[in-house]
């Protein structure tokens, strides 16, 4: 397959799945199993995924640029004691608290996770994670609707719990978005607050992973690979911006249940496919 066509299709997959609770990593692995870049160049596949995830990060920063700007400015003024409004400072602290557990867990368990990703039965593992995550989404939605009222604000304790359970995303196919949204729903948070906090947590988590992989694979950056990487980055950014806007409109009127059903059907379908191949 032409590398630019491959890059375009992967960018579409990334844009659609990164912020939806369906596992972008799982979908990208499934695609690359059939259509790898440059034959068996797994390193380039991995590096390209980081570039399109960076495009996704930029889309969050672009859409919420005013919020991030105001919260950062407010934080500095609070630290310098130029005002008494601590909202911005607390917002940034909550993001750091929520991101900290998965960054530490990912660093500690790196070799073990690399071993899992290299297993020949990875598709079966992905299938199990898709199904398990789908069931959790449906249970979380059912539990949420048993509560007397929904909550919009996410406090420090919520950030800690969401951050801890975000570590489930280290399991291939579980999904970082799913782990954070499921936890937020169990805590009684409304759909928009759950989704947006998941978006915000993505920034430090994906940024840290991106910097690490960029340093690791810097030797394969050259005149042939950089144009393809930048093409994927730009396509991902543009499409992610559209998907996030659609997603926020969708969850204003619907629950996350449809994504749970989708995950279960996908997991069962891939599991059946692996048995037939």
Curated annotation (Swiss-Prot):
It catalyses: di-trans,octa-cis-undecaprenyl diphosphate + H2O = di-trans,octa-cis-undecaprenyl phosphate + phosphate + H(+). The keyword Nucleus does not apply. Belongs to the UppP family. Bacitracin is thought to be involved in the inhibition of peptidoglycan synthesis by sequestering undecaprenyl diphosphate, thereby reducing the pool of lipid carrier available. Coiled coil: none annotated. Catalyzes the dephosphorylation of undecaprenyl diphosphate (UPP). Confers resistance to bacitracin. This is Undecaprenyl-diphosphatase. It comes from Leptospira interrogans serogroup Icterohaemorrhagiae serovar Lai (strain 56601). The chain crosses the membrane at residues 19-39, 44-64, 89-109, 122-142, 154-174, 195-215, 224-244, 257-277. Its EC number is 3.6.1.27. Pfam families: BacA (PF02673). GO terms for molecular function: undecaprenyl-diphosphatase activity. Its main location: membrane. GO terms for biological process: cell wall organization; peptidoglycan biosynthetic process; peptidoglycan metabolic process; regulation of cell shape; response to antibiotic. It is a multi-pass membrane protein. It is found in: Cell inner membrane. Keywords: Antibiotic resistance, Cell inner membrane, Cell membrane, Cell shape, Cell wall biogenesis/degradation, Hydrolase, Membrane, Peptidoglycan synthesis, Transmembrane, Transmembrane helix. The keyword Protein transport does not apply.
């Amino acid at each position: 397959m032409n590398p630019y066509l491959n890059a375009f299709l992967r960018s579409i997959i990334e844009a659609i799945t990164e912020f939806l609770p369906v596992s972008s990593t799982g979908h990208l692995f499934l695609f690359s199993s059939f259509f790898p870049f440059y034959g068996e160049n797994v390193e380039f596949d991995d590096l390209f995924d980081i570039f399109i995830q960076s495009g996704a990060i930029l889309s969050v920063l672009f859409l919420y640029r005013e919020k991030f700007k105001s919260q950062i400015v407010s934080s500095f003024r609070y630290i310098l004691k130029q005002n008494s409004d601590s909202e911005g400072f607390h917002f940034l602290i909550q993001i750091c608290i929520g991101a900290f557990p998965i960054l530490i867990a990912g660093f500690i368990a790196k070799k073990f996770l690399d071993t899992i990703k290299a297993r020949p039965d990875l598709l079966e593992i992905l299938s199990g994670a898709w199904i398990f995550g789908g069931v959790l989404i449906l249970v979380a939605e059912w539990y949420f609707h048993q509560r007397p009222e929904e909550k919009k604000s996410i406090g420090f304790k919520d950030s800690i719990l969401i951050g801890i359970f975000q570590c489930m995303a280290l399991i291939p196919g579980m999904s970082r978005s799913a782990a954070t949204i499921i936890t937020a729903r169990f805590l009684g948070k409304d759909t928009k607050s759950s989704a947006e906090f998941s978006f915000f947590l993505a920034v430090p988590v994906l940024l840290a992973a991106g910097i690490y992989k960029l340093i690791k694979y810097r030797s394969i950056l050259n005149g042939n690979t950089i144009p393809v990487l930048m093409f994927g980055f730009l396509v991902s950014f543009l499409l992610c911006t559209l998907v996030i806007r659609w997603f926020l409109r969708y969850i204003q009127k619907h629950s996350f249940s449809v994504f749970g059903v989708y995950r279960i059907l996908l997991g069962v379908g891939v599991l059946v496919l692996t048995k037939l191949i």
